[in-house]
């Protein structure tokens, strides 16, 4: 067994990452967003209320409008935070109105509200009124299917499946992501599948290999793409050097 692995590793040491997938930055730190906007690897941005709170955002509208003046020409998603569908619609229309003609603003709508009530009727209505949506917090194939059916024939839409959080439950998200991709492709060319809640750099490779349209990841995860195909012996040496440096800085003795 180990001989077969050694033979394989000698001839297949490269990552299968092809760079075809669109990589979005997931976060709400203004500095990181502006810095990453000039990075050709980054093709879009996603935010949510939790990330904004973590980043210390106090004025939702002011933050979003300022970001839009600094990040132009790349898709960016802002999420509604209302829980009642009437108010959710009002917020969605307001957010969509921040688009100045670049067609880069996407409104994030959760698949259900906090009461577990389906957002599908609102999703269908908004999409067919021309609002570009990022339907978020999807975990099941049924949710993906219903969403794709709702936005079919509507405005451009992103379907965000939280693959990382699915894996946190002990389930392999890849089969569901593959089935979801087939549905999105067959339903409408305006629908893109997004791999959300990236847990490790390898997820970027997984999503790319399977043909997923988009993956969103935090800045620290995206920076690891630069390490793809690094010589593993170099990684070993760097690791041991770090151990040595930290033990010296800590002043350890035996």
What are these regions (language model features)?
Residues 16-24, 102-106, 128-134, 186-195:
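Short beta-strand/loop segments at the ligand-binding rim of alpha/beta enzyme cores
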Residues 11-14, 40:
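Metal-centered catalytic cores of metalloenzymes
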Residues 18-34, 38-42, 46-125:
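Active-site beta->alpha loop and helix N-cap motifs at the rims of alpha/beta catalytic domains
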Residues 40-41, 56, 99, 103, ...:
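Glycine-centered loop/turn motif at secondary-structure junctions
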């Amino acid at each position: 067994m180990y001989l077969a692995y050694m033979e394989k590793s000698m001839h297949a040491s490269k990552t299968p990452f092809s760079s075809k997938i669109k990589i979005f930055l997931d976060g709400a730190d203004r500095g990181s967003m502006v810095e990453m906007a000039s990075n050709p690897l980054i093709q879009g941005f996603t935010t949510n209320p939790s990330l904004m709170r973590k980043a210390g955002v106090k004025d939702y509208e002011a933050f979003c409008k300022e970001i839009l003046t600094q990040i132009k020409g790349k898709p960016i998603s802002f999420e509604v935070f209302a829980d009642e569908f009437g108010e959710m619609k009002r917020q969605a229309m307001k957010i969509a109105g921040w688009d100045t003609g670049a067609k880069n603003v996407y409104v994030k709508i959760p698949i259900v509200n906090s009461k577990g009530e389906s957002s599908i009727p609102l999703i269908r209505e908004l999409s067919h009124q021309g609002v570009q949506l990022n339907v978020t917090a999807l975990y099941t194939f049924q949710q993906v299917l219903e969403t794709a059916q709702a936005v079919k024939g509507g405005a451009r839409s992103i379907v965000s499946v939280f693959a990382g959080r699915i894996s946190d439950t002990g389930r392999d998200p890849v089969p569901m992501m593959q089935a979801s991709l087939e549905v999105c492709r067959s339903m409408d060319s305006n629908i893109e599948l997004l791999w959300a809640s990236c847990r490790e750099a390898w997820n970027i490779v997984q999503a790319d290999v399977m043909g997923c349209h988009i993956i969103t990841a935090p800045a620290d995860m995206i920076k690891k793409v630069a390490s793809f195909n690094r010589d593993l012996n170099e990684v070993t040496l760097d690791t041991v050097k770090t151990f040595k440096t930290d033990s010296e800085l800590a002043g350890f003795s035996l």
